[in-house]
């Protein structure tokens, strides 16, 4: 399926920004969004998280559809659980583990989230600590 058809199938408000198509989605809708992306044969690219002043995280999931980037953005409140998509997209494992390492995110639906970039004895959330905003 091409990117235009997939956006139309998923429906909702998509907007073009920075060379990609974006959609805002509540955090509870991410697993459904991932399923729809998989049905549309979108390739999972990555997860990006950035911290906000109120200690929430802006999280975006990115998929590639034959060279067109479809990105879905959600807000994760402080201490909130992020739903895993690794059972839908196994390739999301490393991105979820990296997000855990850097932002101390806990994933609902994962048996474990072992460190990827940190040692097992390191405390997750190193990017939050460098900004002085430990979760």
Model feature map: region roles:
Residues 1-135:
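Terminal low-complexity/charged segments
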């Amino acid at each position: 399926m091409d990117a235009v058809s997939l956006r139309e199938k998923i429906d909702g408000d998509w907007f073009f920004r920075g060379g990609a198509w974006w959609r805002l989605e509540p955090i509870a809708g991410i697993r459904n969004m991932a399923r729809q992306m998989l049905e549309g044969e979108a390739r999972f690219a990555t997860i990006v998280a950035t911290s906000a002043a109120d200690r929430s995280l802006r999280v975006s999931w990115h998929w590639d559809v034959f060279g067109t980037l479809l990105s879905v953005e959600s807000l994760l409140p402080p201490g909130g659980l992020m739903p895993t998509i690794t059972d839908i997209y196994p390739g999301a494992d490393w991105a979820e583990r990296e997000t855990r390492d850097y932002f101390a995110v806990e994933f609902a639906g994962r048996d474990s989230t072992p460190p990827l970039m940190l040692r097992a004895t390191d405390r997750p959330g190193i990017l939050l600590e460098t900004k002085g905003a430990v979760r």
